[in-house]
Amino acid sequence: MTSVLALETSCDESAAALVWRDADGRFEVSSARIASQVEEHARWGGVVPEIASRRHVEALPGLIQQVLDESDSTLAEVDAIAATVTPGLAGALMVASVTGRTLSALRDRPFLAVHHLEGHLASVHLAEHRPQLPYLVLLVSGGHTELIRVEADGAMERLGRSHDDAAGEAFDKVARLLGLGYPGGPAIQAAAEGGDGRRFKLPKGRISLPEGGFHPYDFSFSGLKTAMLRTVEAQSGPLPTADLAASFEQVVVDVLVERSLRCAMDHGLEELVMVGGVAANRRLRQTLEQRSNAVGVRVSVAPLAYCTDNAAMIGAAALLRWDAGARGCSLRTGVSARWPLAQVDQLYTEQPAF
């Protein structure tokens, strides 16, 4: 078995995990720990980068020790060390990156630089049921909403994306509009319980093609956000928060499910994988399961514990790289707030990508 100590500090979650992979390709998470900053950032209505970086510095060493202790392991017994290096908040990324590279140098262990989105894509491999390649991934999080085809050889092709707000970002902004607090995903889900999701008619944003018509797989949530603002402003008397939250949640779910299933069927893909923080949404999981069964598309969803940012998914991504032949990145590798997923292989070239 191969083991990796994985570190994640790309935004507001400090995380460490010890992940193993056996000869049959099965993953085992022997320990995974997260120190969340949600309550602290909630006071500001969103993530404050400087605060996030400071809290990562304070939390990460203790998380690493806790993970090793719970796994009854030591750094000397770990085969490699991995850390998220892109994309994310640059200052926050530096904490895991510098820590990981320092431990790699001190213990003479390979360092594996991981793209945060590659981590989300790998999270589904931590489920009991492993998806069968090729498949379509719906990556839906606070910063990204994309449809990605994954081939049998691991090659990836983006087939759809959001042209403005990501779905998770829209949840945060609408939650703020409704006075529900941060983070928006869980807040709207809770508020929508018992609400009428069909009471308010809201737009399903589409992207026009230059030659006419609409792109069948792309997303746009900015118009929906504006429509919610106008709907709220048009209300008189007490705000029907439950119905507003349910109507917003329902239209986002409908758009994500409809376009994902259409993309899968149009490309002859029999399995749809859903990952990312928004994949934790209960209505989305239930609706996708129901509608996929109706059209004969299998669905795999990342385990609930590994939908939001965590280090176990970073470890899984690193181990997939390891089994594909990667044996480490340059210790001169830095961090980047943005880096295309399509160029992730450049992290493993002799010359650091950044």
Curated annotation (Swiss-Prot):
| GN (gene name) | tsaD
Q: What is its EC number?
A: 2.3.1.234
* Catalysed reactions, semicolon-separated: L-threonylcarbamoyladenylate + adenosine(37) in tRNA = N(6)-L-threonylcarbamoyladenosine(37) in tRNA + AMP + H(+)
* Pfam hit, one: TsaD
Q: Which residues form a coiled coil?
A: none
One cellular component term (GO) for this entry is: cytoplasm
Q: Which InterPro entries match?
A: ATPase_NBD (IPR043129), Gcp-like_dom (IPR000905), KAE1/TsaD (IPR017861), TsaD (IPR022450)
Please provide the Gene Ontology terms (biological process) for this protein. Answer: tRNA threonylcarbamoyladenosine modification
Q: Which residues bind substrate?
A: L139, V140, S141, G142, G143, D172, G185, N281
Subcellular localization: Cytoplasm
Q: Which cofactor does it need?
A: Fe(2+)
Protein's name according to its UniProt entry: tRNA N6-adenosine threonylcarbamoyltransferase
Per UniProt, the cofactor note for this protein states: Binds 1 Fe(2+) ion per subunit.
Q: Which residues cross the membrane?
A: none
| Family from the record | Belongs to the KAE1 / TsaD family.
